[in-house]
């Protein structure tokens, strides 16, 4: 976009007067932020309209996801428009601090972890590549939650990102639809977010649905002074789009989750079919020619019976014809190997919440059951295993595979595990459906925006083509032995570490040494991700430093960031444990110059943008075979952190691309775990035979550490010692500790370390979401570039 200072100033002043009745000189940073956002939208409005018009005439991909973890929009949009520097300078000239303005923006509370961040990266890549694609989700009023720590325990408070509205969401009341449930109906009101591509005029759309009641107020009841019941319908309807992943440990929580899923899927499909009919009328057999729908995990899989409902019940298409359309339209991304995360719904609950959808699901089940009987007449076990409805449970992953034309895993190892184990029956039946699409990240946010110093230096060395083609980074390999380049890469890392130090000092009152090793594990808290292994090693290291104060040791800061699901007690206990150990270590003068532990409160995209560029070590230590892919590992790699990890998920491909000698790989492989399980794993063996491990594990119950009487440490101890150590924390401890000591020693060799950093950056090209999206476009969706 061409930047015209006078036009921007004129438009900004116009917006400030229009919205706040203030001049540019009087405006607060919040008012400037809002006016700046509206100014951006006014300048892209025509391009946005023209993009929609262009896409309406071609095949489009629609990405259905329960979360989109977008991060702040202002800075990212200005960068993608190519006017970030100009806007900063323009604001500074008139005495406005751009950083203060940017800090007025709340992180949109539309996601939680890797699933949502992947979806956000995909939106950026679709727009940048001029591909006709649109996202659909829910406009959560209160998101997942804001995390606070009280006595080291996680406390959840609602996110309030919409308390003053959102400048980037445009309400579209003309596209409102009605969604029907078993016990009534709700209004689905859409809001559109512009997704601005980098270096292009194309502006894609993320459409978010907000739930509203059809009757906000029962006036008769209100006039009887029964105020609570007078607004009951309004409250129940609005609950649907109130929070992401409501606690589902009760039946009411489960019902709300199912209502959420059906709400956003039904609204989205009604919208998609309405727009299809505007162009193609009732030629429904053309749907697969013009519509591709991607199901991001199992949350939106209810879309399969919902599209059947629309086609059969509303449009009068014959069942057999509708089913042919459906299975050519949908594709499904599997994101997990964990059985617990392959969503299942109890028949009674499903029947109550969406009775017609249950009937259709049952019809699909019966149809497939008959097919299975013909395919495997002599294998009743296989027939039973593959049925969509088993006993009283509906298997959504099975419904997804049966109703989709493509099924993809998200890393090479993950896809192989799906084909060989978890989904073996399905792969044998439908080998042509299965393919791999290794996840990716957008380099625009995770390098260009997050690490401008490194981005500028890379551009100085090899030009800026990498911004749209990350494989260009390979050219950096010519500098691997150039000490001037290695010095600069090292110094940029120190600079980013100092920025993080300052941020943590301001926000959490913690002082850390920027010259220490920054060893970072930031991700959702789950037992399989093994934050427990990390903190056990830290506690053991502390004990060693206490026993041997003269031990040769490079100062190290261990940085954690994680949210635990509100109902996940063990995960919350591990957060307490990390903070318990941190309090002991950080308060001990004997180790204060050597060791520090920091738990970053309320980890989110804006904080991640400060952490990834500052990290020396990327902790990717999940139990081998449990992590589907991961994308944090890619963000760390792109910013020059070295991976300390198991051969799991995308770690396998990172080690392959950069060379295993440039990472720190430890622990059992998938085949080692298989062999150990076959032999019989007894956690008491490492507990009794690995030096120092018994002392660490027993600290959970011997009074060395305190859970403040909650009993959760004893629960964790029991999971390890009496319930089989399911994630092999104790078995992998010794190799993990040994690898940590190797890192500590090798960090002292500055040039060797910097060379490994540069090798990682240079080989991060594969992990761009641009590459991933092009593969989806060509091999799954069959969509083509549609540049305006």
Question: What function would you assign to each model-found segment?
Answer:
Residues 1-788:
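A conserved ligand/cofactor-binding region detector
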